[in-house]
Amino acid sequence: MEELQGYLEKDRSWQQHFLYPLLFKEYIYIFAHDRGLNGSIFYESAEIFGYGSKYSSLLVKRSIIRMYQQNYLIYSVNDSNQNRFVGHNNFFYFHFFYSQMILEGFAVIVEIPFLLRLVSFLEEKKIPKSQNLNLRSIHSIFPFFEDKLSHLNYVSDILIPYPIHLKILVQILQFWIQDVPSLHLLRFFLHEYHNWNSLITPNNSIFLFSKENKRLFRFPYNFYVSECEFVLVFLRKQSSYLRLTSSGAFLERTHFYGKIEHLIVVVVRRNYFQKTLCFFKDPFMHYIRYQGKAILVSKGTHLLMKKWKCHLVNFWQYYFNSWSQPYRIHINQLSNCSFYFLGYLSSVLINLSAVRNQMLENSFLIDTVFKKFDTRVPVIPLIGSLSKAKFCTVSGHPISKPIWTDLSDCDIIDRFGRICRNLSHYHSGSSKKQSLYRIKYILRFSCAKTLARKHKSMVRAFLQRLGSGLLEEFFMEEEQVVSLIFPKLTSFSLHESHIERIWYLDIIRINDLVNYS
């Protein structure tokens, strides 16, 4: 980020807050590649044309030279659409590759104002960079749950509505990006996206292009979600005597992430022409969101949560001109329900404990209530995800993976083992890890059936010939991983590893098999 700031300080066009001229700057594409922001297109796509990786910068320069030509973008897209059935026409590949390269650079450009806002926010709050990296872990939210949710009463499970038209997204961006050519170019890309998306064919090279251009088209939706959260800060500013403890918005690679603590509940009356605002101060309210799902928890009453629900529905309707169904917001009492978030089924358990109290010659038994935040793995939905991925049937019976039979034995075992270890790593915070045994069983026998199908033998005969230990080393248990990380913790027994929850700070995205909501 410091390198990009150094380039922008020297660039006169950026000093006048113009984004469009940055599209012709070579350092934008170099920055996109060096930072790992979908940079694979600069190497993998170059190999399709027969170039090595050392020619990637040459392709960038050629693309910039062609963009100086009048109406190049329009001709490039039209040529791509007209030649979609030509086959392996190099003319088609070159034009399509240049278009995708422009997309990669433009995706970085439109994020620059918000990245700089993030840097200024971190400098203002004096947040060290190392702590900023920890904020990227989605598992860091669960320790926050453990500290706060046991003292709260109600939870609102919210599904943020999707905007009905992309034009609304561009209109929202106009408040933050005043560069008109950049907005027109963004509108052009969004309009032509459906044509490019229709180019998905079994050909791996074409699928690569379609897979790599999602970053730009996620950006308007992520900004729309951020605007939905911005109303909380906006309404707080309308009430000068009510103080918001802390608020912040963090721009990550693919998702906006915001966590606001101690919100001030502000509900606008139905008569929007009145200037009277009805304030409900609730210092014990917390808001958490990931992607399009949000959780709003409060210590207040059920009436307060219903007012929040009414407020959110009206806000989406009048501000974004989109109808939001009230059933997308569920209000439940924490002690009587479980809510799904980030692949975990979370709830607040109530434990009763009898405490003996001795007072002089009399003794009393006092019943004490303890609330504990609990997280478990929803096994049935996870089996459904494995079924969609063709690892098992709907009922959970393991099946072979025919598409992987062309791979070597080591590659097959490595793929299954990596999936199993990633699931165990992601669900390390579950209080009952025994529920993952069924998932590991499905993956192990699916791997064995795939290998047996490749060698045209029965599963039992294949395992007897090579031994069941063939698969064990590729499915390392979580307690063995913990023992490698913390070798001095000799008291960490096998039984305790299935009870204690472990949250890792290296998980920056939800697991693909877990993202089934």
Swiss-Prot record:
The keyword Secreted does not apply. GO terms for biological process: mRNA processing; RNA splicing; tRNA processing. GO terms for molecular function: RNA binding. InterPro entries: Domain_X, Maturase_MatK, Maturase_MatK_N. It comes from the Eukaryota. One of its GO terms (cellular component) is chloroplast. Its main location: plastid. It is found in: Plastid, Chloroplast. The keyword tRNA processing applies. Keywords: Chloroplast, mRNA processing, Plastid, RNA-binding, tRNA processing. Belongs to the intron maturase 2 family. MatK subfamily. Usually encoded in the trnK tRNA gene intron. Probably assists in splicing its own and other chloroplast group II introns. This is Maturase K. It comes from Caryota mitis. The lineage of its organism: Eukaryota, Viridiplantae, Streptophyta, Embryophyta, Tracheophyta.
